[in-house]
Every structure is written in structure tokens, then in C-alpha cells.
Design a protein with these regions (language model features):
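Bacterial Sec-dependent N-terminal signal peptides
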Residues: 2-11, 283-284
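Short, threonine-centered small-residue motifs that mark membrane-proximal processing/anchoring sites
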Residues: 8, 13, 22-30, 249-268
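Hydrophobic h-region of N-terminal signal peptides that target proteins for export
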Residues: 17-25, 272-275
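Extracytoplasmic Ser/Thr/Pro-rich, glycosylation-prone low-complexity segments
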Residues: 29-256
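C-terminal membrane-anchoring or membrane-association module
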Residues: 275-288
């Protein structure tokens, strides 16, 4: 199985290069998001709002059929769905009411994605939202699994919590979270309708895959991708950071923190001291 997968990997990697170089891809509209759009954090969104990360996602299909239906959620290359949003999500001009949760770090529309080669949002076979499209494998005893939380109206949260990588490795575990909001959600200033949140991200690829990819794709080559996707070192770029995107898939700048009253008092005291010192220096000497 490993030898076959290695062969498939080589073929898929070659195809990925062809996709990048093909005229079709050249005609597609691809927007690159700079790493500076990410904000240091180190927390999940659910750490901030409380309530946990939700229930384990049980796979309903995917490449490794032996893991389909396992109540533990442990699997390799599986997906679950379709799952209803409970609202309408407009994505690349199309309205969606349901999605597929894919073990390999993304959600998709219309069909599940079991591909383990992260061709990125530009090469995905279906419309995709990808906080970390990579070769996730949660079969290792030390690995966490994919969770879904949908108890908040107009909000869907998926968490790949401390997940391992192929082939059932659990010596390094990535932790990342996706937040999707419907039109009925009152979005606070400084937040958006889609959020990517990352904790520790110590692994980025496997022996039979390539570095992960981050962003959005419409399944036809048009995409919004984070700079460095499919390039070694991307895991360090996203680790312990987060980013919100608005309805146009543009990054939302974070709101600058408002100084606390005590901070204001210290600032005013400092300004008063500087003003007094300035007046003292400008005061003419009476001894002359």
C-alpha cells in the first residue's frame, strides 16, 4: 500500500506542476494573501468564547474505507457529509447550505475530498475552504481527531485538534481551527465571516506528500491563497496565529487594543510631567 501510495504521490506531484504551468491556471484569478495578514495568538477561537470544540466527526466516505463509520473518528483520507450549515453561505458567487468535512484539513462543497496531496485551493477538485490542506492521519494512538461544533446560531466551527500525519505518525501534532459564519451572524468589528486559527504546527508534510496549503478555491482554478502555500516552512508562518476574512475573502485587520483606564492615567501623568519639565527649561533665569 505504501509503495502504491508513493507511486501515486509522484504522479500527483507531477500533475500539480502541470496544473500550475497550464494555460488554464494562467487564466484563473488567484489572489495571494501576505503572511503579514496573520496576527499572533496561539489560541483557538473557542478558547476565547468558551464551550469547547464540539463533537467528534465520524467519517462517511473517503480513500481509506476501513476507517469509515469508526465512532472514534480516527481515519486516513476520510470525509463526512453532506453536513447542513443551518444557513446559506455565499462562496465565490454560489450559495451553499451544506458542506463536507474532510480529514485532510479542509471543507468542501458538492463532494468530499479525500486527496492527500495538497494541490492547494487552485487545484482542488471541488470548491474548498482550507485552513491547512495537508496529509492528516489521525489513526495514531496519540493523535486527536476532527471535531464539529454547531450549537451557536449562524456559526460553524471545525477543529483539527492535535492531529497526526501519514502514516499514523503521532510524534508531532498540528492544531488548527476553522470558523464559518452565516449572514445572520452579527460580526464584531475586527472579525470576519471566515476565520483560521492555529496553535502549534510542528509538521508540514509527509514522505508521500508535500507542504500544506492555506486558502480558498472555487474548484475551477480561481483561488485566494496564503503566500508560501505548498512551500516548506509554511507551518512556521501560520503557527500560533490567526486571520479573519470578510465576505469578499479579504483579510480583516485586527482592532488595536483600547488602553485601560489605568493606562490612560499613566499616559496623562507622563504628559503632565513632560509639560512641566519643558516649562522649567524655558523659564528665564532671575539671577541674570
Amino acid at each position: 500500500m505504501s509503495a502504491l501510495r508513493s507511486f501515486v504521490c509522484r504522479i500527483a506531484a507531477a500533475c500539480m506542476v502541470c496544473l500550475v504551468c497550464a494555460p488554464f491556471a494562467a487564466q484563473a484569478q488567484v489572489t495571494v494573501v501576505p503572511p503579514s495578514a496573520l496576527t499572533p495568538s496561539g489560541s483557538y477561537y473557542t478558547d476565547l468564547i468558551g464551550g469547547g470544540i464540539g463533537n467528534v466527526v465520524v467519517m462517511t466516505g473517503g480513500g481509506n474505507a476501513a476507517n469509515v463509520g469508526d465512532p472514534s473518528g480516527r481515519n486516513d483520507d476520510g470525509f463526512s457529509g453532506p453536513i447542513g450549515f443551518g444557513y446559506v453561505l455565499r462562496f465565490f458567487g454560489v450559495d451553499y447550505t451544506q458542506f463536507f468535512a474532510n480529514n485532510n484539513g479542509n471543507i468542501s462543497f458538492g463532494d468530499g475530498i479525500s486527496e492527500f496531496i495538497p494541490t492547494g485551493p487552485t487545484g482542488a477538485s471541488a470548491p474548498v475552504i482550507s485552513p491547512w490542506f495537508a496529509d492528516v492521519d489521525t489513526r495514531g494512538a496519540g493523535s486527536g481527531v476532527l471535531h464539529l461544533r454547531n450549537d451557536i446560531a449562524n456559526e460553524t466551527i471545525l477543529t483539527w485538534d492535535a492531529v497526526g500525519y501519514f502514516q499514523a505518525h503521532d510524534d508531532r501534532l498540528d492544531s488548527f481551527q476553522l470558523v464559518v459564519r452565516g449572514p445572520g451572524y452579527a460580526v464584531p468589528v475586527g472579525e470576519g465571516t471566515i476565520g483560521f486559527f492555529y496553535k502549534g504546527m510542528p509538521w508540514e508534510q509527509t514522505d508521500t506528500s508535500v507542504t500544506g496549503a492555506v486558502g480558498f478555491g472555487d474548484g475551477a482554478g480561481n483561488a485566494v491563497v496564503l503566500a508560501g502555500s505548498n512551500t516548506p516552512g509554511l507551518n512556521e508562518v501560520v503557527a500560533n496565529r490567526f486571520v479573519w476574512f470578510d465576505q469578499n475573502l479579504e483579510p480583516v485587520p485586527p482592532v488595536s487594543p483600547i488602553p485601560e483606564p489605568r493606562t490612560y492615567a499613566l499616559m496623562l501623568a507622563g504628559l503632565a510631567f513632560l509639560a512641566a519639565l519643558s516649562r522649567r527649561r524655558l523659564r528665564p533665569s532671575l539671577s541674570r
